C-alpha cells in the first residue's frame, strides 16, 4: 500500500500490475529523452552564431521532425495496445466473485459457492490502535486464493461507484443496471488495500476495500467456516 512520501507506484501483487509498472518506466524513459533533446536544441539555438537565420526551408530537417515523432509513438503505442488487450482477456477463471457498490459500503457474493455473501463496511478509526490504517480498514475482508485466476463482476445498486485495487492494477466501474467484469491473479499473500474511485456522495471516502490473499488450503477452510 502507499505510505507517506512515497513517490513511486505501489508494489505489484499481480502480473498485470507488474507489466503496467514496466510500461510506466518505459514511457517515462522516452519522455525523459525527449525533454533532454528539446533542452539541448533550445540551448544550442541560444548560443549559436545565427549562421542559418535566413534559411526559409530545409527538406531534411522537416523530414526528420516528421518521421521522429511517428517512430516515438510506435514505441509507445505498441506495448500500450498489448497491455490494453491483455487486461481485457479472461483466462478460464478458477472462481468468480460479484461485488455490488452501495452508498456507502460494498457487498460481495461468491458465485461458485452456496450462501457465501457478506457486506463490507469501513471500521471506525481508533486513535489508540497503532495497527489500524485510517479510512482503509473493513469489518469483513475479501478473502481470495493466490496464484489463481479470479474473475470479478462489478455493479452498483444506487449510484456510480468504482472498485479499485492499485496494487493489482484493477479499476472497474460499478454502474447501476450494468455488469462490468475484469480478471486478475494475485501472486503473493498479504492484505491489499483499495478504495472507491468514483465520487458517489457525502461518504465517498468511507468505502475502503481490503483483499486478504491466502493459500488455497486456508481459503477452503475460510469458505467452510463461512458456509456453516
Swiss-Prot record:
An example Gene Ontology biological process: ATP synthesis coupled electron transport
Mitochondrial intermembrane face residues: 1-26, 83-228
Mitochondrial matrix side: 49-62
Cofactor: Cu cation
Protein residues bound to Cu cation A1: 161, 196, 200, 207
Binding of Mg(2+), residues: 198
Stored Pfam families: COX2, COX2_TM
Major localisation: mitochondrion
Keyword Electron transport: yes
Location(s), subcellular: Mitochondrion inner membrane
Catalytic activity reported: 4 Fe(II)-[cytochrome c] + O2 + 8 H(+)(in) = 4 Fe(III)-[cytochrome c] + 2 H2O + 4 H(+)(out)
One term of GO molecular function: copper ion binding
Residues in coiled coil: none
Keywords: Copper, Electron transport, Magnesium, Membrane, Metal-binding, Mitochondrion, Mitochondrion inner membrane, Respiratory chain, Translocase, Transmembrane, Transmembrane helix, Transport
Catalytic activity, EC: 7.1.1.9
Residues where Cu cation A2 binds: 196, 198, 200, 204
Transmembrane feature ranges: 27-48, 63-82
Biological role: Component of the cytochrome c oxidase, the last enzyme in the mitochondrial electron transport chain which drives oxidative phosphorylation. The respiratory chain contains 3 multisubunit complexes succinate dehydrogenase (complex II, CII), ubiquinol-cytochrome c oxidoreductase (cytochrome b-c1 complex, complex III, CIII) and cytochrome c oxidase (complex IV, CIV), that cooperate to transfer electrons derived from NADH and succinate to molecular oxygen, creating an electrochemical gradient over the inner membrane that drives transmembrane transport and the ATP synthase.
Family (UniProt): Belongs to the cytochrome c oxidase subunit 2 family.
Subunit structure: Component of the cytochrome c oxidase (complex IV, CIV), a multisubunit enzyme composed of a catalytic core of 3 subunits and several supernumerary subunits. The complex exists as a monomer or a dimer and forms supercomplexes (SCs) in the inner mitochondrial membrane with ubiquinol-cytochrome c oxidoreductase (cytochrome b-c1 complex, complex III, CIII).
Protein name: Cytochrome c oxidase subunit 2
Organism: Zootermopsis angusticollis (Pacific dampwood termite)
Gene responsible for this protein: COII
